[in-house]
């Protein structure tokens, strides 16, 4: 499916001030960037602009500031340094976003140089999409580029605001994300196997519904599986469950059956007597979960069942872990799925969030066809929803 918005290729950026909303929301501990995936993902757009003599002004959020001013642990300064290191470019940083210092730093940017502004969320008006914020940011540029796919589903000041005042186009990452995630559902090579995990049915209901409409096989794991067990009349002990969603889960099972879509649920589970890293796993069948145990991961027989389905696939979409993969004792299921997807002869799309963390944890990122940088944005796109950030851009 062709991208329907203008991109940086479609505009003249030579000598222009190009304001770029990137997604540099990366993990930082003690001033050190832990995962550079999102920084690297922004490089094609940044490099293109530098090569075409643009004056590049980058803005992003980092973490969840209170919006009451500077918080040192959430400053983008370490990210700016990491960007310079990864790109080899001349990157400046200004510890300001909307004030005089920022305006002066923007005015000093020369063609082919890069400036990183401070965290846009240090001001609470950013989240409210305050027009004053939008106007201020727009005053820094001649052109606006949105390349932050991870925040494209949020109608916030730095995401949609400048598009009201400047010619607004997409960066290469945004274009690729939208193309890939919409394309996989428009014309997937079959068999198309979708894998959905995570804790709650309620948070993935739209995604599950959409996948039943497009996939050949839907694999379900993680905490949400126990709500489906309840819909089948099984007992789940102390496992995570959403009583209010049992009926809806049952309706989805019925819908899948009517459409000829195969739904695979765990046939065995790793359970424990408490939730914790020190919990000792026991393997039990799905119809024999003890009342005093809670499910923490899929079991070994389920791993084989799921891996076999993945092996036959030509297209795989995966979002959400199979268990509490942060605990080593309960990471087996997620690792088994990650390895199966990596080994399969298929187009593999990893749909953001915890699945990306899992793929990175098991060092399998380079074996996947596409790893999305968006969590919520990926899911909303998969559900068929319009993303406010994309909607605000100029039509091609």
Model regions and ranges:
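Active-site loop-to-helix "anion-binding N-cap" substructures in soluble metabolic enzymes
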Residues: 1-396
